[in-house]
UniProtKB/Swiss-Prot annotation:
GO terms for molecular function: large ribosomal subunit rRNA binding; structural constituent of ribosome. InterPro entries: Ribosomal_uL11, Ribosomal_uL11_bac-typ, Ribosomal_uL11_C, Ribosomal_uL11_C_sf, Ribosomal_uL11_N, Ribosomal_uL11_N_sf. It holds the Pfam family Ribosomal_L11. Part of the ribosomal stalk of the 50S ribosomal subunit. Interacts with L10 and the large rRNA to form the base of the stalk. L10 forms an elongated spine to which L12 dimers bind in a sequential fashion forming a multimeric L10(L12)X complex. Forms part of the ribosomal stalk which helps the ribosome interact with GTP-bound translation factors. Keywords: Methylation, Ribonucleoprotein, Ribosomal protein, RNA-binding, rRNA-binding. Belongs to the universal ribosomal protein uL11 family. SMART domains: RL11 (SM00649). NCBIfam families: L11_bact. One or more lysine residues are methylated. This is Large ribosomal subunit protein uL11. GO terms for cellular component: cytosolic large ribosomal subunit. It comes from the Bacteria.
């Protein structure tokens, strides 16, 4: 018989830097999960990623206090800020542009996020990421 799911926990943890301090410790502790076991497994799984990039993770906690987790790709906003060399997006994205990204940079981001995007082809995925860039106040070159 399959294990009974007790909870789903969604967190953003920096790649390779999971530790028992907040937000990881309290979120897992209230469900009785072994926090150090999660931290070691997460850090091992994300060691190939660039250290410090926020990585969304969905943790499934079962009634016997065991768990599984699935990592997602880094949020598009973080990758866009990194590509444009910014600390944050524009406070007024429609009127005040804060940086520029090219189509080549957008294609790199699409390749990194391919598994989490629902677009059917590269052009549609680039347009999706370009929309996120415009919403952050970035100017997009080479995409209509």
């Amino acid at each position: 018989m399959a294990k009974k799911v007790q909870a789903y926990i969604k967190l953003q943890v920096k790649a390779g830097q999971a530790n028992p301090s907040p937000p990881v410790g309290p979120a897992l502790g209230q469900h009785g999960v072994n926090i150090m076991e999660f931290c070691k497994a997460f850090n091992a799984k994300t060691q190939s990623l660039e250290p410090g990039l926020p990585t969304p993770v969905i943790i499934t906690v079962y009634s016997d206090r065991s768990f599984t987790f699935e990592t997602k790709s880094t949020p598009a906003a973080v990758l866009l800020k990194k590509a444009a060399g910014l600390k944050s997006g524009s406070p007024r994205p429609n009127t005040q542009k804060v940086g520029t990204v090219t189509r080549a940079q957008l294609e790199e981001i699409v390749v990194a996020k391919q598994a989490d995007l629902t677009a059917s082809n590269m052009d549609a995925a680039v347009r999706t990421i370009a929309g996120s860039a415009r919403a952050m106040g970035l100017e997009v070159e080479g995409v209509n």
